[in-house]
From Swiss-Prot:
Belongs to the chaperonin (HSP60) family. GO terms for molecular function: ATP binding; ATP-dependent protein folding chaperone; isomerase activity; unfolded protein binding. Keywords: ATP-binding, Chaperone, Cytoplasm, Isomerase, Nucleotide-binding. It catalyses: ATP + H2O + a folded polypeptide = ADP + phosphate + an unfolded polypeptide. Forms a cylinder of 14 subunits composed of two heptameric rings stacked back-to-back. Interacts with the co-chaperonin GroES. Its EC number is 5.6.1.7. Together with its co-chaperonin GroES, plays an essential role in assisting protein folding. The GroEL-GroES system forms a nano-cage that allows encapsulation of the non-native substrate proteins and provides a physical environment optimized to promote and accelerate protein folding. GO terms for biological process: chaperone cofactor-dependent protein refolding; protein refolding; response to heat. It comes from Geobacter sulfurreducens (strain ATCC 51573 / DSM 12127 / PCA). ATP binds at residues 30-33, 51, 87-91, 415, 478-480, 494. This is Chaperonin GroEL. It holds the Pfam family Cpn60_TCP1. PROSITE patterns: CHAPERONINS_CPN60.
Amino acid sequence: MAARIIKFDQEGRNAILKGVNTLADAVKVTLGPKGRNVVIEKAFGSPLITKDGVTVAKEIELEDKFENMGAQLVKEVASKTSDVAGDGTTTATVLAQAIYRQGSKLVAAGHNPMEIKRGIDKAVETIVAELKSISKPIKDHKEIAQVGTISANNDKTIGDIIAQAMEKVGKEGVITVEEAKAMETSLETVEGMQFDRGYLSPYFVTDPERMEASLENAMILIHDKKISNMKDLLPVLEQTAKSGRPLLIIAEDIEGEALATLVVNKLRGVLNICAVKAPGFGDRRKAMLEDIAILTGGQVISEEIGNKLENTTMDMLGRAKRITVDKDNTTIIDGDGKEADIQGRVKQIRAQIEETTSDYDREKLQERLAKLVGGVAVIKVGAATETEMKEKKARVEDALHATRAAVDEGIVPGGGVAYLRALASLDALSLPTEQQFGVNVIKRSLEEPIRQIAQNAGVDGSIVVDKVKNSKDAFGYNAAEDEYVDMLAAGIIDPTKVSRSALQNAASVAGLMLTTEAMIADKPKEEAPMPAMPGGMGGMGGMM
C-alpha cells in the first residue's frame, strides 16, 4: 500500500477552506443578472463559455490533494442542488463557502464544532419552514414566464417559450430540449401519444407528398409477439374489412408472408392498413403496450394472459379518432380508453416514480406518464454558432428545471430577498450559547447571495444588504436595472424549491467540513527521471 499523508485540526481545515474558496470564487462570478461568463478550455473544439454554476464547478480539479477535497465537497453541493431543483447551483456554492468560512473562524477560536453544527442544522430547519410559509403558489402563464426568464439569465424569449410549452402539455407533460438547425428558437408540440417506431413498409403510406400514413377513426391490434404466419391474422382482418374501418397493427415484428399479404391488400384497396413495431424493449415494451391498450380501450393480445391472435375479436381492439404514422414515429390521437382506467394507470406509474432509485428508470416512467396525460413538447434551440448554441441550450435546460420547481412548490421573492426576510424567524430560537453561534453563522451567511449579486453588478454589497434588510415584504434590489423595487411585482422571483434546496445542501456539506478533524491523502509519487539515450553503435562514425 502506498504511503499516505495525514493533516490534523486547523492545518486540515485551512487546506479545505483554500479549496472551497478557489472553487467558490470561480463559480460566484456568474451569480445574478450581471454575473460574468466563465470560459472553459476543452480538449477538442472551441472553448465552452458558460454562466451556469454547476458547469463551472464540474470542470475544477485542484493540484493539491487536500485543497481538492474541499473543492470536491462544494462541487457535490452544486451537483446535488442541480439534481434536486435543476437550478440554484451558484447560490448553493456561495452559501456553502459563507457557512464554512464563518464556522471555521469560530472553530479556530476554540468553539465546539459539533455544537456549532447543531446550531446550523436547527437554524436551517427554521429558515426552510419560513420559506415555505412565505411561498406563493404559481398561478398563471405570466408568472411561469417570469421564472423561466430569470433562470435563463433574463432572456425573455426563453421564458415565454417555456411558459407556452408548460401551458400546452401541462404539469406532467414531457418537455425536451434539442438543437435546432435554424437560427431561431422554436417550440413544437405533439398531441396524443407518440412513440418512436415508423411504418414497416413505405407501401402503407396514404399521403405520398408527406410520406405519411393517416388513419381516421381506426382500430388498433396490439400484439406482444412476432407475426409471420398469415393464417393467425386472417380472422381479425376479415372482421376489420367487414367493418370498413382502417387498422393499425402494433407487434414485436411483422415479417415474411404476413407483411407481404398486408402490403398486397393495401395496394389493392381491400384494406386501409398500417403495421409498426412495438416501442421499447423487454419489460418496458410490455408496459408501453399496456399503456397503449389502456389509452385506446383495447387489450394486449398476449398468450401470457390466454389471448391467442387467431381468436381475437373486434371488442379486443383499441380505437382512436386519428393515427398518423411516418417513417420514424407513430402518433395516436384521441384514444377511446375509459377515463377511470387511464387515471388508474397514471396513479400506478406515479407510485413507481416515487419508488424507483434509478434516474434512467425515473426518466422513462415520466415519459410514459406524459404520453398518457399530457403530451410532449420539444424546444428547438437556435443560435448563430455552435459555442452559442451549447451555452443557450444549457440556459434553456436550467430555466425548464426552475420552472418545474416553481410549479411544484411555489415562488418567493428573488435576488436573495427571501433569505433576508426569513432571518427574522431565527430570533425566536432559544438555544445553548455554543449552538447560538451556529445560528449566527447562518444569519451572516444568508446575506451572502444578495451581497454577491450586488458586487457582480458593480455596487457595494454591504449598502444593498443594509437597505433591503431594513425594509419589508418583497422590497429588494433589481441588479439588472440598478434600482430598488417590489421583487414580486417586477417579476424577479425564485422557485421556493431552489432556495430551499440550495440552503439545505450547502449547510449539510459545510457542517460536515466543519466537524472534520483529520484528512488523509495519497503521497504524491516522485516521477523517476527518463533514462539517458544509449550511445551510437560501433563503426557508425563514417555515416553522414
